[in-house]
Amino acid sequence: MYMARCGPKNNVLCFPFQLSFLFSKRLINKRFKYTLQTEDEKDMMGSLSKNKIITPEDVEFKLAQLREFSNTLKERIHNTKSVNSDGHQSNSIAPISEDSRNVNVTKISSVPNEEKSKNLSDLIHSSFLEKMDHLVPKVIRERVADDDILAKNLFDRSHSNWAPVIDRLYVSEKRFMDIDSREFSVWLNGTVKYLPFHSILHLDEMLLEQINGDVVKFNTHMYECIFNNLGNLKPTNFNQDGTNDKVILKMKELLERYDKALKITEERINKKEGFPCKVPKMTQAILNNCLKYSTKCSSFHDMDYFITKFRDDYGITPNKQNLTTVIQFYSRKEMTKQAWNTFDTMKFLSTKHFPDICTYNTMLRICEKERNFPKALDLFQEIQDHNIKPTTNTYIMMARVLASSSSNAVVSEGKSDSLRLLGWKYLHELEDKNLYRHKKDDLNSFLAMMALAAFDGDIELSRALYYLFIAKKYKTLCANWKGNILVDQDTIWKSTLMPEMLNYLMLAYARFDPRNLPVLSGYEKGIELRRKFLREFDSSMRLDDTDKLVKFKLPFLPISDLNSEAQVLAESNAIWSFNLENGGTRNTLTSSNEAALEDIKKYRQLLDSFAQEAEDFNEFKFKVMYEVTKMQRESINVNVFNKISLHTYLSIPINLKQQKEFLRRLTFFTFQQHEFEAVIKRLYEGYRNIPSSHTRDQNSISTEAISVSKPETTEDLNLIMHDIWYITCLRHKIMMDTTLYELVMKAAIEFQNEDLAKKVWNDRGKFRTTVPFLKMDQRIRIAKDQKFAHLMVEFFTKQGKYSDAIAIILSSKNRFNWTYSMVRNLHKALEEIEDRNSVEILLDVVNKKSHAKALKWEEQELNM
């Protein structure tokens, strides 16, 4: 039992720790009440003479001081383990009765105020000084000359903010002058972090001033402190590529300063001038901060510059941490070939550079993008062979790699079900191991299960997983919501709905086949897991029983098993609209005729003002596009409405062979760039003939109030109304790109619709002349053109128009690299009809590779 000593030294009383802490607590409470009463009286008297306002920050500061004092006092009492030899031993003290406790407490609490050596404010102040000595050196505290700034920004070490302290020192008189630079820089490097850019500049200026501008004395700790703060910054949104980035420029400036210091030191040594000084050294930590910020900017040029600079000039090669950062950069930039080369370098460079589990997880993520399941299995075997402990994310990534690889029969080598079964077994193994789970691992685990279920076409399990995850997230947000839940439903649903979960659910609808048996139904553990999720999924009620005020509903059909194509189409439409309308809090996709007319009148006036204010067509077009973007953000949940989810949503009627539904979805949710530009041009030319709207009654929105230079016919008015409605509907549309044109061509192949194929051929030809296509990289443009040409060949082959298919191949043989896999179906069809001449021409194109062309491609690859 811990002992504590209370009372005067000449009369020592020993109490158990709990009782002594009780005494201290009561004494503190009494003193605190007395102090508050005294301070209240003083404040009341002082308020009569002058207006003194106590801010909430001051109250919080005083309370923080009091809490700190209480913690310090508790620690002191706890650390008192024994008393002096003249005092009583703990084992010889009899337990104190309740009456004795009450008497002693009364005596202690009745000590006269004049005998108290210190009041509560003095104790708090002494505790504050003791705490502050551990945070900042005494000289810094004196030059800041404001304890409030230090306390408010530094007391909570988990959320310390050094920027106000550095800025206060910057405006002080002495700054860092007359301070020992060595000891000070050691403290500075390990303490001052997460400064904004302007405070970093202030700190750098004060450090240079401290050493009188002698860059030779700018030591390693100073460099590490500055680079560490620079590396933690985030690039601005408008400068993501690192071009002329102020942080990159500052890093290069510091490296130039270091080079200058090395040069000056070498000259002094050669001339034997002054005392020999220690040359600062560049470190791996500095290189890592340079690479960390370069990867944030997605700047390959700057990253290569820093690696080359440190290797050639300073003899510092990238370590494991540096190389891992580089691999993560390659992964984000889709530079998979460079990532694999760097990964192989790490494995064979040395044992110090051997990849850790973080690097392996990054490579597994690349395997998922490449759908390379054999390589992923090899990586997992390497992890086990080298006794590297897998993390939760390792098993999740293995499941996701196998799920994505099973999506294609060619990639999966005809073993799609086996890959999905293996993916589930990795998740079972993860559950059995009970590894540490990060807060994001639950989301990743749900996404992995959704991927396996979606690619398997298991709609029942996908619906259950989607419902359980969204319900859990929604209820968690509502439980922790600080505002009005009923009023803030729009914000809550926007934070709840996730595009990845929606995309996997749409994929499950697209792969619907009532004849297929889910993979999990083939073994006992899978049956138990699937039954567990289905049992928790309530497809009919969907009401939170714990709080009747919070209603959670998803628009699933009130049936547990979807068994028809009509049900799948209906539920997919309902879920899609529910997500786009932000949980049903908006009414964007469905509007009455009256609401449509109101929108037309509203935007007719708005477009009129844009046309009158714009100096030229480009400015008018910019204003309209900005307004469309604004409309979309206000009326649609843009977090879930993207090209990936739309592509999956449009593929549902294609796989279910529902042509009418596909065309409806395509028309309602997409628009084409050339059509948009034609509408904008017509509106601009029409509005430029209308007088300024200032001469018109602002309150009237009828068509009679609009005067034009020439009479408008009914046909003209209908065209204007149609164009305005076209602009209004863009809030729930996405512009067609090369991927969507390819999807439409796949639909034409599936439906054998020649008119649709001709239309998409012409529309894509017009799209190739627009700015979005021309801005694409040339290699990407060629690859996209080749993919579309391949689809056209497939269409003509299925139509039996073999001469047209061969004509496309011959006309593009010098532009595209036609392989046998691209013309396999055409070759088989020609063999069936025994067209030997066409077969010979086709194989000649596929097999013919001129030596000059091969050298040209090799040269381009080397230049890249």
From Swiss-Prot:
Subcellular location: Mitochondrion
PPR repeat placement: 319-353, 356-390
Entry's Gene Ontology BP terms: mitochondria-nucleus signaling pathway; mRNA processing; RNA splicing
Keywords associated with the record: Mitochondrion, mRNA processing, mRNA splicing, Repeat, Transit peptide
Any single Pfam family the record assigns to this protein: PPR_2
Gene3D superfamilies linked to this entry: Tetratricopeptide repeat domain (1.25.40.10)
Ribonucleoprotein recorded as keyword: no
Main location: mitochondrion
Superkingdom assignment: Eukaryota
Transit peptide extent on chain: 1-76
Lipoprotein among keywords: no
PANTHER family for this protein: PENTATRICOPEPTIDE REPEAT-CONTAINING PROTEIN GUN1, CHLOROPLASTIC, PPR_LONG DOMAIN-CONTAINING PROTEIN
General function of this protein: Regulates mitochondrial small subunit maturation by controlling 15S rRNA 5'-end processing. Localizes to the 5' precursor of the 15S rRNA in a position that is subsequently occupied by mS47 in the mature yeast mtSSU. Uses structure and sequence-specific RNA recognition, binding to a single-stranded region of the precursor and specifically recognizing bases -6 to -1. The exchange of Ccm1 for mS47 is coupled to the irreversible removal of precursor rRNA that is accompanied by conformational changes of the mitoribosomal proteins uS5m and mS26.
Family: Belongs to the CCM1 family.
Other facts noted in the record for this chain: Involved in mitochondrial-nuclear incompatibility, a major determinant in reproductive isolation between species, through hybrid incompatibility of Ccm1 and its interacting partner 15S rRNA between yeast species.
Assembly and interaction partners: Binds to mitochondrial small subunit 15S rRNA.
Name by which UniProt lists this protein: Mitochondrial 15S rRNA processing factor CCM1
Organism encoding this protein: Saccharomyces cerevisiae (strain Lalvin EC1118 / Prise de mousse)
Gene name of the encoded protein: CCM1
